[in-house]
Amino acid sequence: MSVVAMLEGADAADRATTQTAVGIAQRLNVPVRGLCALPDPTATLIVMSTPEATGLAANATRDIAALQDQVIARAKASFDDITSSGSHGLTCTFSHVVDIAERAGANAATLADAVVFPHSVQKVADPLSLSFEYVLMEARLPVVMAGTTPLQAGPVIVAWDGSNGAARAVRFHLSIVKAFGEVIIAQNEKDLGKDQQRDAANPAALEEWLDTHNVKHKRMPIEGEVASSLLALAKGSGASVIVAGAYGHSRIGERLFGGTTQRLLDAPERPALALAR
């Protein structure tokens, strides 16, 4: 098993992603893999019928390949700079995969302990935005979004409402939850009334499940708007990660009108997010 850092060739984003990946991997004692996925330049070619057009296509392919080489070089440099010290005691490798980032991300998330995306993927224009959305929304595999600051030694916050998304998030990310050692169960009881309540929404159900995995836990109720309350709790407790179900309502609706997931993704300051849908 390993922790995979999804890289895009942007120095600041790749450094933060790698730092988060290394921080998680240290606690799990597993290798780190830096992954830069770019499609085959020739895959975008349109069949041309004239010699002139064919020549133009060949030139375009070479230009795209040259640009990709630059992206790969930047991604590798950022990854190597963070991991080269060796003080973390982990095996760290960089790889370039010829594939679309959506498929490469889903393949990585299938069996990895964690797949870490940069904080910037909440922006539609980010190179890895489609990959992040595909892995989370279509493949329905777990993802980690790097925080705006390095991982701390604090607890993990689990945003618990008994929903399928929350359950999948905590089950998918169990290894991370156990590695950080302590869980804060956060719940806004008033917010539960917005949807049909489930018996599993009772924090006691999660507490019993955590007990079977020997994970320490405590409850800390929150009030008001969920996302801002979670962020305030994370800041006050020094939490390293927020584990949460993602997009319990329409993703488009959340983007247009706001929602807990979208507000967490858009927050200018926050810890890492471990998400599942």
Each model region followed by its residue ranges:
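Structural beta-alpha unit
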Residues: 13, 39-42, 66, 73, ...
